[in-house]
Design a protein with these regions (language model features):
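Boundary at the C-terminal end of the N-terminal hydrophobic targeting segment
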Residues: 22-25
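Local sequence-structure signature of Cys/Sec-based thiol-disulfide redox active-site neighborhoods
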Residues: 27-67
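Structural micro-motif
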Residues: 84-96
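Non-catalytic, surface beta->alpha helical segment in thiol-disulfide oxidoreductase systems
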Residues: 96-122
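Solvent-exposed loop/turn segments at secondary-structure junctions
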Residues: 47-51, 72-74, 90-91, 100-103
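Bacterial N-terminal signal peptides
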Residues: 8-16
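Bacterial N-terminal signal peptides that target proteins for export
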Residues: 1-6
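Structural microenvironment flanking redox-active thiols in thiol-disulfide oxidoreductases
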Residues: 74-83
Length: 122
């Protein structure tokens, strides 16, 4: 009985949050990568970082279109490493909006879409 009440309450919350409509489909990774690049949202990471590798896999082939700064190769990419120091990057991955707002850790495509201000209409 308690489980049935709990499930009913959770369903009501879900309907209230989502407005009773179908959940929005995940954004197109390529379109999102292009949007992030065009709006100057920067992605800081390291080639050694498992979380960064996972973040990249979420974008699939579009990962090459991301505005990425490599923080883990200071000898090979000193300008990028200096940018990481200037932005005080302490965790990977780190995403930074042009206004300085940041998110650390792996972000879902949906969260990046909303956070970056990308239109959610297909």
């Amino acid at each position: 009985m308690f489980k049935a009440l709990l499930l009913g309450a959770l369903s009501s919350v879900n309907i209230a949050i989502h407005g009773g409509s179908a959940v929005q489909a995940a954004p197109d990774p390529g379109a999102l990568a292009d949007h992030l690049s065009q709006t100057k949202v920067m992605y800081y990471g390291s080639w050694r970082c498992p979380a960064c590798q996972y973040q990249g896999r979420l974008f699939g082939d579009a990962v090459t279109r991301l505005p990425y700064v490599e923080c883990g190769k200071p000898k090979e990419l000193p300008i990028q490493a200096a940018a990481c120091q200037q932005k005080e990057i302490r965790r990977y991955p780190t995403w930074i909006l042009p206004n300085g707002e940041r998110r650390e850790g792996v972000q879902s495509l949906e969260d990046l879409q909303i956070w970056s201000g990308m239109s959610q209409t297909p």
